[in-house]
Amino acid sequence: MFPILRPLAIVAATAAASPAFASIPFFNATCPMNIEVHADQGGPIYINGKQAKLKVFNAKAYEATHNHVTISVTVNPDGTPLVSYTARGGANGICMVK
């Protein structure tokens, strides 16, 4: 890619992703296997106190990954989050939002 186009592409991609990132609701959740999840309004998402890598699918669906744990967050039409997890060894389930 031309040197001048690379920064422009990065800025465009960031600008497009920012509105979706902003719709993450504030929540705390507890999952089996002693997994604690916290999200600030607009992000980021923390798994057991560590900031997770966030993947945005759309304005209502996200995945946060840290240390072999993936947290899936879907935002319901009323704004409440539905949180589930997948961990090493195929462990998975629904998390309790507090």
PLM regions with names:
Residues M1-A22:
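Classic N-terminal secretory signal peptides
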